[in-house]
Swiss-Prot record:
Keyword Transcription regulation: no
Gene name of this polypeptide: hemL
UniProt EC number: 5.4.3.8
Protein name (record): Glutamate-1-semialdehyde 2,1-aminomutase
Gene Ontology terms: cellular component: cytoplasm
SUPFAM superfamilies xrefs: PLP-dependent transferases (SSF53383)
GO molecular function ontology, one term from the record: pyridoxal phosphate binding
Amino acid sequence: MSNNQILFERAQKTIPGGVNSPVRAFRSVGGTPRFVARAQGPYFWDADGKQYIDYIGSWGPMIVGHVHPEVLSAVQNVLADGFSFGAPTEAEIEIAEEICKLVPSIEQVRMVSSGTEATMSALRLARGFTGRSRIVKFEGCYHGHADSLLVKAGSGLLTFGNPTSAGVPADIAKHTTVLEYNNVAALEEAFGAFGDEIAAVIVEPVAGNMNLVRGTPEFLNALRALCTKHGAVLIFDEVMCGFRVALGGAQAYYGIAADLTCLGKVIGGGMPAAAFGGRRDIMAHLAPLGGVYQAGTLSGNPIAVAAGLKTLQLIQAPGFYDALTAQTKRLTDGLAAEARAAGVPFAADSIGAMFGLYFAERVPTSFAEVTKSDIARFNRFFHLMLDEGVYFAPSAYEAGFVSSTHDDAVIDATLAAARRAFAALAA
């Protein structure tokens, strides 16, 4: 048995499914998860000592690569001062100022420890601000594992959602309406039917949990206009795409301002950190100023803040996003070319440093289109690439990520491996 297999068997005795987040278990693709021993730059090494090119990067945070020397130094510099205080620090102010500078729609921001905390708190705040209960989300968009958000649409346009997770009470699910992503007509119909009941619309402007699916400008502009007209709070969940698709996130990319924004991943630099923020008049409803309660013992943790602040400083280097975007596009264009040469139906897309791979004839625009991809072929491709030492997301429904350390040599090695993998698929 390999060390990975030994560790997985051992883990399953004390950890449900052997993992602390389901996608890590390889249930979608089959096989044994890789247990990471260490990482550096664009690579990680598993428990058996094998090196992999990493296109997950901790699911997005590692935009400057693993163990960047300046991020490491920033963390080391604060460790000796204490791990956690449960009291304010100057560093919390500094990272808040940096976030507000980079995302102008965020006038005030509250730090939390996870993306789920950020979205859950933003929804509570929107409900407290509006005095309404109904929220609208979109099929295929993932906003963490809070009860209100683990809901998927029924067959009808305006049906109430049914829980997609056991343990979510129907009384909670009934307040969530799920619509089709990028469907402007469905959106207009929903607002026409009950627009004045909607507390908030929460959306991934660039979805990354049904693979990569871009919000269309028409769809996102319609969201902005309808929320403004009906007094609903527009929440952009940029936990994944924030500081990934552009320096100012999706809002800078599309030129659309949200009322509230949820951030995570990059702002922690690999440490547990997230945030939600937005208009000052909405944020004023948070305790201790207002009646919407939200708290967290480790919110603004000094070690996480140090890693996040240094990462936010590094990504502001001149040309950082131009180079990162070009390198990501070089990867996806190259993969598409290799698939064409092998005669394998395949499409790829990228925006900033996020990318999607689809075993389909074209890039999807909705969850329904994503589900038409050839999942069995993706699973085989995943394992062929894994054998080659290239680690893509172990699910056909997840986006991938490139870091500033994925240089030409790394991309070339990936494309050479893909050439062999696509040839094997076509055989």
